[in-house]
Amino acid sequence: APNVDDQSLLHTGDWPFGRTNHYFFDLNRDFFLLTQPETRGRVALINTWRPQIMIDGHEMGSQSTFLMGPPRQPLNTNIDTDLQKWAVTFSEEQGAAFDKRSWRYFTGEWFENWYPGYSNYSEYRGSMHILYEQSRMAEDGVRRPEGTVQTYMESVHHQFVSTMANLESLATHSQAMYRDYWDGRKYNVSAKSKFADKSYVILANDNHGRMAALVERLDAPVSYTHLTLPTKVT
């Protein structure tokens, strides 16, 4: 018989498994730290392919409904305002797909966009990041407080419709998004950018292997100096 009680073992994950690698490290916190081999592989693909959008489809507590963007404050100030604008557009069009089917959802509430170690790392490379979370149903579905049973098939349908809505939005707005991307990248390397004429100094210590590993992971132009240079600490 189906077990729709979300307190049962069927609906309970085996801690700490589920979202960690075999080192028990949460890979959805590692995107800019790059401590894990899986993360370094993901980031290398993002930096190589530079996708226009990156979708992160999650699950959450079974007694919730469906979370979609845009995120709430605080927002990281290093994220381009154009990406924030498009996040609102995509969310509204995804929400319209849910409204059409009378599905419950909420937006702009509990998840913020400050920490760059989530999959939203893609936004710092110019790609729009989309997160949504479906209440977890497992195999048999879950009885909700009002007495209805939401099935696993319904939860998959929500994720599928969300993805298709995002792809339809991308097809509609792709050219305008490319123009914003080009303008933003061009500005960021211009003399007017807040990043213009800036260098970052890392003081070396006796652990040369650790320094070499950091340089490799940064994948950025690096030079070494043995001179004493004046610096301004900010």
Question: What annotation goes with each model-predicted range?
Answer:
Residues 27, 55, 132, 163, ...:
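Divalent metal-coordination and catalytic microenvironments
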Residues 1-88:
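Active-site/substrate-binding loop(s) of hydrolase catalytic cores
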Residues 225-231:
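Conserved small/polar residues in nucleotide/adenosyl-binding loops
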Residues 143-187:
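Catalytic cores of secreted or luminal carbohydrate-active enzymes
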Residues 126, 131, 135-139, 153-157:
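Mobile "lid/hinge" segments at catalytic clefts and subdomain interfaces of large enzymes
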